[in-house]
Amino acid sequence: MSMDNENIIGIDLGATNIRGGIVIDNKLSKITSNRIHSSGTVEEVMQDVFGLVDNLIDKNIKAIGIGVPSVVDVKEGIVYDVQYIPSWKEVPLKKRMEDRYKIPVLVNNDANCFALGEHYFGKGKGCDSMIGLTIGTGIGAGIILNNHLYSGANCGAGEFGMVDYLDKCYEYYGSGQFFQNVYHIDGEIVFKNAEKGDPKAIKMYEEMGTHLGNAIKTILYTYDVELIILGGSVRFAYAFFSNKMWERIRTFAFTKSAERVQIKISELENSGILGAAALYYDMSA
């Protein structure tokens, strides 16, 4: 679907701040941000959201998309147990915003928005089957199949980090948690040491890369996609773990899939905002 002449607000709700902007003719403009009272009441946080949207809204806005770090009932627009905002449990975000602004509002998980952002604006353009894989303190994923976001029957698709693995799960071993969980050291310290050439730090990344490679194999067994785009903070250490990651991927049983799948590193700025706006285009296409 063409995005020309469609003015859509995209909102990226994070742990400490909320960011938003307007997508006009495929370009992001009027980027703004506010602090979030993450320890506040439901209503206090809601007013933070309203305050940002009030600064962006005008009569030309056709819809609002918002990405949140939470499981989301996409149809009803209810967010459950939002990370880092304890009071936000079963919040009817879609209804509250539509009641206020009188235009369509779409709500989805932030990893799904990342995938949509890459699909419409980033390295996933022109690819009809891909996964946006975010690797930070956890693992999240957004799945694009046949050029559409796939959320699953209960809006829980893409939670690969929760798949059982060894004695825990993939997220425990294949994300930034790995360093604290296994070696009891902060991941940022490991990254800085690896940049200095510390062999112990590089070895830790290689070990994490082995686990991540196994996670990606599981993804490929489940969804035989053309492309995986890595986002999240751990992607900046790709040079330290990529070889071991690929060693595991190449043991995939279906040789053609392992040979053909591409893994790219996200370079898209404001992917959360862009992806939230793209929720409207995904719905309308």
Name each model feature, range by range.
Residues 36-38, 87-88, 157-159:
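A short acidic/small-residue loop/turn micro-motif
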Residues 24, 68, 75, 145-146:
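A cytosolic small-molecule/anion-sensing beta-strand core signal
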Residues 105-109:
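General beta-strand structural signal in soluble alpha/beta enzymes
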Residues 1-63, 73-78, 95-103, 118-122, ...:
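ATP-binding/phosphotransfer module of carbohydrate and carboxylate kinases, centering on a glycine-rich
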Residues 69-72, 136-138, 234:
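Short glycine-rich anion-binding loops that position phosphate/pyrophosphate groups of nucleotides
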Residues 125-177:
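Glycine-rich phosphate-binding loop of actin/hexokinase-like ATP-binding domains
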Residues 115:
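Acidic/histidine-rich catalytic cores of soluble enzymes
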Residues 77-90:
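A charged helix-plus-loop insertion that forms the helical arch/lid used to bind
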